């Protein structure tokens, strides 16, 4: 499962 703490969403 993905880690929301390490999640990065580029614009």
Swiss-Prot record:
A GO cellular component entry from the record? extracellular region
Q: Does the keyword Repeat apply?
A: no
Q: What does this protein do?
A: Tachykinins are active peptides which excite neurons, evoke behavioral responses, are potent vasodilators and secretagogues, and contract (directly or indirectly) many smooth muscles.
Q: Where in the cell is it found?
A: Secreted
- Source species: Aquarana catesbeiana (American bullfrog)
| One Gene Ontology biological process | neuropeptide signaling pathway
Q: Which family does it belong to?
A: Belongs to the tachykinin family.
Name the source's superkingdom: Eukaryota
Name the record gives this protein: Ranatachykinin-D
Q: What is its main location?
A: secreted
Task: For this UniProt record, give its keywords in alphabetical order, as a comma-separated list.
Answer: Amidation, Neuropeptide, Secreted
Q: Which residues carry this modification: Methionine amide?
A: 11
Q: What is the lineage of its organism?
A: Eukaryota, Metazoa, Chordata, Craniata, Vertebrata
